[in-house]
Amino acid sequence: MSHLNIATLDASQHPYLPASSQTLFAAKAKKKLSFEEISQEIGRNEVATAAIFYGQAKASPEDITNLSKALDIPYELLEEQLSGFPDRGRSVEMPPREPLIYRLFEIVQNYGYAYKAVLNEKFGDGIMSAISFSTKVEKETDADGNNWAVITLRGKWLPFSRY
């Protein structure tokens, strides 16, 4: 399906991304596929799929096979580029300058301690895992026709150990 709103990559704006990012985004743009469509082809959540494209999530052998088929990329090339371990957290400068990413950063700046306090009251002393974790993005439209972004973060609660 052809879309007007397809996320693409300007590699000059992202010098820390792995080579696989350029390979994947070029094929995605050529086929005019959304992350939602690709995620359906490979059997992953659309945010997890996008994280593979940005080098922030590890692709399984099954992911590599399915991405190769969905995007018409030679399997051997993807296997070479995606078989290592991600170098997570290096792709975004801090503080972020990209407006949408900055808004997410700003949410944590403004509400981080409030989240922490409420989570500690509900669960005790600990942290929410970003490893045993899932996330999703949904679109809601209210009665007035306004669009709302709904981002769900689901992380396993990890209590701090006493030692």
Curated annotation (Swiss-Prot):
Record's keyword terms, sorted:
Lyase
* A Pfam match: Cyanate_lyase
InterPro entries per the UniProt record, alphabetical = Cyanase, Cyanate_lyase_C, Cyanate_lyase_C_sf, Lambda_DNA-bd_dom_sf
What chemistry does it catalyse, as a reaction equation? cyanate + hydrogencarbonate + 3 H(+) = NH4(+) + 2 CO2
The protein's GO terms of the molecular function aspect are: cyanate hydratase activity; DNA binding
Report the EC number(s), separated by commas if there are several. 4.2.1.104
Q: Which GO terms describe its biological process?
A: cyanate metabolic process
Protein task = Catalyzes the reaction of cyanate with bicarbonate to produce ammonia and carbon dioxide.
Q: Which NCBIfam families match?
A: cynS
UniProt similarity note: Belongs to the cyanase family.
Cite the PANTHER family for this sequence.
CYANATE HYDRATASE
Descriptive protein name: Cyanate hydratase
